[in-house]
Amino acid sequence: MSSTAAFCLLSTLGGYLVTSFLLLKYPALLHQRKKQRFLSRHISHRGGAGENLENTMAAFQHAVTIGTDMLELDCHITKDEQVVVSHDANLKRSTGVNVNVSDLKYCELPPYLCKLDVPFQRACKCEGTDTRIPLLKEVFEAFPETPINIDIKVNNNVLIQKVSELVKQYKREHLTVWGNASSEIVDKCYKENSDIPILFSLQRVLLILGLFFTGLLPFVPIREQFFEIPMPSIILKLKEPHIISKGHKFLIWLSDTLLMRKALFDHLTARGIQVYIWVLNEEHEYKRAFDLGATGVMTDYPTKLKEFLNNMSA
């Protein structure tokens, strides 16, 4: 390669790197900042599954009472096309009855067990007396001013259509976000109702990471408004240390190192994209998430997170 060609190559590469860095820090130079209809720092996972039975009206009411910014919940559809709030398609874990939500009419759904495992806290259980599986419309009616984060749990066109209809019926487009890890489900949600903001699918999260580490992210338009990701390091506390292999620990460390990037979070939030990290239940996890620039934290313990935020702002 001649010296002239080498100089041109280095100049081009240098110009690209400088431009990429500049737009990473100041994305408004290229992209219009997304309008944020609400801002959520405190997000109650399944309503706060460590303080009340998950996805129940009691859990949602408790979270709203203590001042949560957002309720996170999961939706399925029954045989008679009722949209219900339940995490699992099969109810064996949560009710003790081995049936699928989609195979029963709403009136036939069994109640939740009175004691359930806390999903992201090892060896912890939560007890409660409100064991009824609620309808999504009940949640909308009870909390008309509260932002709600909906995980569409199955790739079902009727479910997506019904959720969209409910959001429109209760005029909640400005207070709702929906999606799933599946890119197919997210695409269907966006096609069904583009007025409801969407979450990044897993495929899109991985794409964003690839674009970030190659310096291309600042040049790429983004349609999603909510970057919702796990903190991989919490996996270590969910299992007994002796059963996690060295290879598994390395993969967790690598995932955590790649995903928990302050520069990435700062760029996304500067573009008006909220960054939510799940599911964190300890104060040091809360602190790390906010120190990294996360917009909000999703927790099973809304009271604990509320106290942390109060102390942080004191």
Curated annotation (Swiss-Prot):
It catalyses: a 1-O-alkyl-sn-glycero-3-phosphocholine + H2O = a 1-O-alkyl-sn-glycero-3-phosphate + choline + H(+); 1-hexadecanoyl-sn-glycero-3-phosphocholine + H2O = 1-hexadecanoyl-sn-glycero-3-phosphate + choline + H(+); 1-hexadecanoyl-sn-glycero-3-phosphoethanolamine + H2O = 1-hexadecanoyl-sn-glycero-3-phosphate + ethanolamine + H(+); N-hexadecanoyl-sn-glycero-3-phosphoethanolamine + H2O = N-hexadecanoylethanolamine + sn-glycerol 3-phosphate + H(+). The chain crosses the membrane at residues 4-24, 196-216. Coiled coil: none annotated. Its EC number is 3.1.4.-. SUPFAM superfamilies: PLC-like phosphodiesterases (SSF51695). Residues 40-309 form the GP-PDE domain. The keyword Cytoplasm applies. It is an enzyme of class 3 (hydrolase). GO terms for molecular function: lysophospholipase activity; metal ion binding; phosphoric diester hydrolase activity. Residues 1-3, 217-314 are extracellular. It is a multi-pass membrane protein. Keywords: Cytoplasm, Endoplasmic reticulum, Hydrolase, Lipid metabolism, Membrane, Metal-binding, Transmembrane, Transmembrane helix. It holds the Pfam family GDPD. It is found in: Cytoplasm; Membrane; Cytoplasm, Perinuclear region; Endoplasmic reticulum. Disulfide bonds: none annotated. GO terms for biological process: glycerophospholipid catabolic process; N-acylethanolamine metabolic process; phospholipid metabolic process. Its main location: cytoplasm. It comes from the Eukaryota. A divalent metal cation binds at E72, D74, H87. Gene3D superfamilies: Phosphatidylinositol (PI) phosphodiesterase. Lysophospholipase D activity is increased by magnesium and manganese and inhibited by calcium in a concentration dependent manner. Loss of lysophospholipase D activity by addition of EDTA. Hydrolyzes lysoglycerophospholipids to produce lysophosphatidic acid (LPA) and the corresponding amines. Shows a preference for 1-O-alkyl-sn-glycero-3-phosphocholine (lyso-PAF), lysophosphatidylethanolamine (lyso-PE) and lysophosphatidylcholine (lyso-PC). May be involved in bioactive N-acylethanolamine biosynthesis from both N-acyl-lysoplasmenylethanolamin (N-acyl-lysoPlsEt) and N-acyl-lysophosphatidylethanolamin (N-acyl-lysoPE). In addition, hydrolyzes glycerophospho-N-acylethanolamine to N-acylethanolamine. PANTHER family: LYSOPHOSPHOLIPASE D GDPD1, PHOSPHATIDYLGLYCEROL PHOSPHOLIPASE C. Belongs to the glycerophosphoryl diester phosphodiesterase family. This is Lysophospholipase D GDPD1. It comes from Rattus norvegicus. The gene is Gdpd1.
